[in-house]
Amino acid sequence: MSTKAIILHSGGLDSTVCLLLALEKGREVISLGIDYGQRSRAELEYALKLCKRFDVERKVLNIEWDKPKRVIPKSRSINEIGKEVSSAFLPGRNALFLVLACAEAAGIGASEVWTGINSIDYSGYPDCRPEFLEQFRKMINLAIPKGPEIIAPLISLSKPEIAKEAYRLGIRQGDTWSCYRPFNTNNGFVPCGECDACVLHKYAWEHIPKQTKVKSKMNKE
């Protein structure tokens, strides 16, 4: 009997790589999205398309969240992005999503929750750090005894390394969504190309490691 795993899946590069890694490892996968009124509705559409493509069950939790207003920076360089936490950062989002995923996992008998958080390169977000993950695991073990194991296979990978893994798994640059400020056109959503997410996405694909054989950093961190 295969292990049932919930994947926190936004439709972005990181979470989609997690989804495909879980499938590759033979997990019984459920893609879990969170509809919290995000301005980038395109990510929900992309996640659904990917689930249909890879024949994965998709579930979306709807929550009401009166989020703080944030300024989405644009046209920043890679170096600028890496210097400080972006004003686009939504405090507590990853913690909240992980709690919801763990609660969902406990309810359906899933023994794993996978998340695409990563701390290398330019994220800088406090809830993408190994220290956060370590403390969250301790907290959730108290809240849900014998609850799901939290798997974060990308925690020590750079963005280009994640893009390389995506390529290996059959994903190309336009298959996932990574934009905070999309344009809604008659032909669908179009990335702005200027926000931090777009800049990092482009950087990742343009700087994929050239080596054809590298030792994998994948783990169950």
Describe each model-derived feature in a short phrase.
Residues 1-170, 216-218:
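ATP-dependent adenylation/nucleotidyltransferase module used to activate substrates
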Residues 99, 175-182, 186-203:
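Local cysteine-cluster metal-coordination motifs and their immediate loop/turn environment
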Residues 204-213:
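Short cysteine/histidine-rich zinc-coordinating motifs and their immediately flanking basic loops
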